[in-house]
């Protein structure tokens, strides 16, 4: 009897196995020729579920949504630099959400790179600006170890997307082995000196506020925020946050206003601004004669902890330092009645508050029409709201796809504008293929309405015919029902409040994805 030879791992197998060893359970992929051995490695790794996405922006947005639900990174599989660039907008959004994500980017075999083949590019130069960490596994011995490093780096010091480049020959050569197991890095604990300084500043302030994000927006974190509110500190969230626990039984913080002048007016008179789990607030854009830093005159900003800190623990420590025994009230369930008449953003918000089931995840890419839905669901059944953090529209459907696959037993609602939805409508195909429990609500106004608003705010003048063509989505109008059904997702039009309310009730009751094209006024 002869001994059977021991099969060694390929570089691709070492990479995939290492990520699985570290708890990665999802891969959102749009592979090409250079990634074929990674595809095979995924086929042999039952711990990771692979989902095909027809556009890289869907893959990266879905990985973001998956991680926002699970708290651990998902893997993306992207085809060289061009594939990375296609997914770049939603990687940018994930970076702004501090979302851990491991982007595996295939590349040409190392000996082939010097020939400048048509798909050759500077992958490091392209991926570097949006990556917290980036390395290339140029030898098979590096593949597993760099995969472990990538996973670890996605958690910090500041969480976010990382990029691991895998040349084709590294993927196919044997001699790989899994990387050494890493422990998950923790967010930084509160700094006692900063807590004491903040408590002292609060006691001498007349109108203190605190801006929060991160773990402070979990259910447990909001319970601590309610204690801070009871101590006399106004609590506000960032304008856009990765995820917030909301609805009945949860404390309702205020939210920073979007427009600079509105935010400054809202904060007028504040003399102390504490920061926990985020950064000093700044305006989304510069406008003539408007401030960029949203701190009122006479107000002192004080950083207690940035995005790399456990902001829920900061709030608890601050409340303790202030001797707070009470807590501010939480939201009570208040479901509105059925809306009637014309269909508009307020009617849609009322229907969402009526029918959204407990435990629902909401992916908000609603742009100009999203605010009423946010406000009207404050006292709805308990749910989690996920927002567009980086301003690159087209995140809504991919984020919802990833969230749904991370929590298939919970419903996910996507609200998106028709302009935003067209960036990544291919997510519908993946939803249909996976049977994702996503209800998509598309605000159809045949316009980039937010840009019409911004045109006036920037002082760019009155739009003429050419400007109107650049800001409108008519000629031809997009038929969202046909677009959705062509990708396997049942859909319906709604033109009145009654039609929308009935369609939404049916959509939440159904299994699998649904889409409602909600026809709302352009202005």
Language model regions located:
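A general structural motif
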Residues: 55-56, 115-117, 185-197, 216, ...
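Thiamine diphosphate
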Residues: 104, 112-119, 371-523
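Generic enzyme active-site microenvironment
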Residues: 236, 363, 415-416
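N-terminal alpha/beta PP-like core and its mobile active-site loop of ThDP/TPP-dependent enzymes
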Residues: 2-325, 439-440
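Active-site diphosphate/adenylate-binding microenvironment
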Residues: 12-25, 30-33, 38-45, 329-409
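Phosphate/pyrophosphate-binding active-site segments
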Residues: 2-6, 141, 165, 177, ...
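Short, glycine-/Ser/Thr-/acidic-enriched flexible segments
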Residues: 83, 109, 169-171, 215-217, ...
């Amino acid at each position: 009897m002869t001994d059977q030879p021991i099969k060694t791992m390929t570089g691709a197998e070492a990479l995939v196995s290492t990520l699985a060893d570290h708890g990665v359970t999802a891969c959102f992929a749009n592979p090409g020729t250079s990634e074929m051995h990674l595809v095979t490695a995924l086929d042999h790794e039952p711990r990771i579920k692979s989902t095909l996405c027809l556009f890289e922006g869907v893959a990266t947005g879905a990985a973001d949504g998956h991680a926002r639900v699970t708290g651990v990174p998902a893997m993306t599989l992207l085809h060289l630099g061009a594939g990375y660039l296609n997914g770049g907008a939603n990687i940018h959004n994930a970076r702004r959400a501090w979302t851990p994500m491991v982007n595996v980017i295939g590349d040409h075999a190392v000996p082939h790179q010097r020939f400048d083949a048509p798909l050759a590019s500077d992958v490091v130069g392209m991926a570097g600006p949006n990556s917290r960490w980036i390395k290339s596994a140029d030898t098979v011995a590096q593949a597993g170890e760099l995969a472990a490093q990538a996973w670890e780096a996605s958690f910090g010091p500041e969480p976010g997307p990382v990029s691991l480049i895998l040349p084709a020959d590294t993927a196919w050569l044997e001699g790989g082995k899994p990387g050494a197991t890493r422990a998950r890095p923790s967010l930084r604990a509160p700094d006692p000196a900063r807590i004491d300084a903040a408590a002292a500043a609060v006691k001498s302030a007349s109108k203190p506020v605190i801006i929060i994000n991160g773990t402070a927006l979990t259910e447990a974190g909001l319970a601590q925020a309610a204690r801070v509110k009871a101590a006399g500190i106004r609590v506000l969230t960032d304008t856009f946050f990765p995820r917030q626990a909301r609805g009945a039984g949860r404390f309702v913080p205020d939210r920073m206003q979007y427009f600079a002048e509105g935010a400054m007016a809202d904060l007028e008179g504040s003399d102390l601004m504490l920061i926990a789990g985020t950064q000093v607030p700044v305006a989304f854009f510069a406008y003539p004669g408007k401030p960029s830093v949203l701190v009122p005159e006479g107000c002192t900003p004080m950083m207690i902890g940035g995005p790399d800190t456990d902001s829920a623990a900061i709030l608890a420590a601050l409340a303790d330092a202030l001797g707070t025994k009470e807590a501010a009230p939480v939201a009570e369930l208040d479901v509105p009645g059925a809306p009637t008449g014309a269909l508009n953003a307020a009617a849609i918000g009322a229907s969402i508050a009526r029918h959204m089931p407990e435990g629902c995840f909401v992916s908000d890419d609603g742009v100009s029409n999203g605010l009423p839905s946010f406000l009207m669901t404050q006292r709805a059944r308990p749910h989690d709201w996920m927002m567009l953090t980086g301003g690159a529209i087209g995140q809504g459907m991919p984020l919802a796809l990833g969230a749904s696959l991370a929590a298939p037993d919970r419903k996910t609602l996507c609200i998106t504008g028709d302009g935003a939805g067209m960036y990544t409508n291919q997510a519908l195909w993946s939803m249909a293929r996976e049977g994702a429990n996503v209800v998509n609500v598309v605000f159809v106004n045949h316009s980039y309405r937010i840009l019409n608003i911004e045109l006036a705010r920037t002082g760019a003048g009155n739009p003429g015919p050419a400007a109107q063509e650049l800001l409108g989505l008519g000629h031809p109008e997009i038929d969202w029902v046909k677009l959705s059904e062509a990708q396997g997702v049942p859909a319906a039009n709604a033109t009145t409040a009654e039609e929308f309310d009935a369609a939404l009730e049916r959509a939440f009751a159904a299994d699998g994805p649904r889409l409602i094209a909600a026809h709302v006024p352009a202005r």
